[in-house]
Amino acid sequence: MAWSQSARKPMIGLLFRAQQHGARGYSYSAFQAHLSSSNVDQSATLLRRFSSEVPASEQMNLIKQLRERTSAPIKDVKASLVSCNWDIDAAQKDLRKRGVVLAAKKSSRTAAEGLLAIAQDEKRAAVVELNCETDFVARNDVFQYLASSLAKLALSARDPGELVFPFGPDYLEVNLNVNLDHPKLSGETTVQSAVTELAAMVGENVKFRRGFIMSTTAHGVVCSYMHTCPQPGLGRLAGLITLEAEDSNAPLDALQRVGKSIAMHIVATKPLFLSKELVSASAVENERDILRTQAESSGKSQMAMEKMVEGRLRKYFEEVVLLEQKYVVNDSTNIKSVLNDLSKEVGSKVTVGNFARMEVGEGVSKLFQQILIVTRKRKEWILSK
């Protein structure tokens, strides 16, 4: 019996030591690891690892908070929190660093969706195009906020001194920083950094693609129309036009009313030229050749075919020339007649300065060429009137 009691003493001592270690925060497995090695550094590492663990409920709360702050994908949010030992501020910085890498990987993907945004004052209007990959992201409030902010930034830029000034991403990137004030996107930063951060949030390729600024004279107005608007100042299609009155006393509110209606007309009808005089000779001759070939198949006389060609050519002008187009609001008249009626109403001759139509995802060069054609020959058109 004495032998049996003495044999129990080492076991009792061992259990007592285990209880002591358990009280210090070790699990049983950690205690075994401690007993199996005399290495002090190893036990210290285990202690740090176990003391830094965050309860599951707190982990979910941190993931939720960081997700609300950044809108980043949940898997990226969790990865940053884990790598930063569940420090939410450090994880937020880590997410921004990851965003640069992710945005670079996505930059080659096609971004043909998105929104146009417009900012406007009495004499100038700025339109920008911000692209993404899906219309789902285009409905995101952060995406819409950044698009509007870029339009306001373009409008606040130094007056380029041109009535129509098309620009690419470098114009805003080189000249100005954007000051953002959104819960998920804030602070003063470059345009490229803001776009990159947004791309990381939404998980898509996001690009600021292009824009233009349109101005008018002292006796004119800039009128605009946005189609399919998720909110004011945003849309997928934009029409702009400047109307100018010869008399400085002409009421500009009447010009605004009619101008907005014509801007809507421009979105609907897609005019390519301002007047017949501005249609290039090569374009007219090319269309005439096509119509003549079509007429020859009719088997009619030469005189009849010429009349047919001229009639169809007038129809062509009605399709592509703004002043000759049937007014979408009232197809019994055309835009030229609408402007004549407006001139009588305000007691002063009213003319079109410039116009533009822009659509999300369309070719940049086509828009720029259209605007430059109208602008470059504006004086010639006025003289021909």
Swiss-Prot record:
Its main location: mitochondrion. It is found in: Mitochondrion. Disulfide bonds: none annotated. Keywords: Elongation factor, Mitochondrion, Protein biosynthesis, Transit peptide. The keyword Protein biosynthesis applies. Pfam families: EF_TS. GO terms for cellular component: mitochondrion. One of its GO terms (molecular function) is translation elongation factor activity. It comes from the Eukaryota. GO terms for biological process: mitochondrial translational elongation. InterPro entries: EF-Ts_dimer_sf, Transl_elong_EFTs/EF1B, Transl_elong_EFTs/EF1B_dimer, Transl_elong_Ts_CS, UBA-like_sf. Residues 1-50 form a transit peptide. Coiled coil: none annotated. Associates with the EF-Tu.GDP complex and induces the exchange of GDP to GTP. It remains bound to the aminoacyl-tRNA.EF-Tu.GTP complex up to the GTP hydrolysis stage on the ribosome. Belongs to the EF-Ts family. This is Elongation factor Ts, mitochondrial. The gene is EFTS.
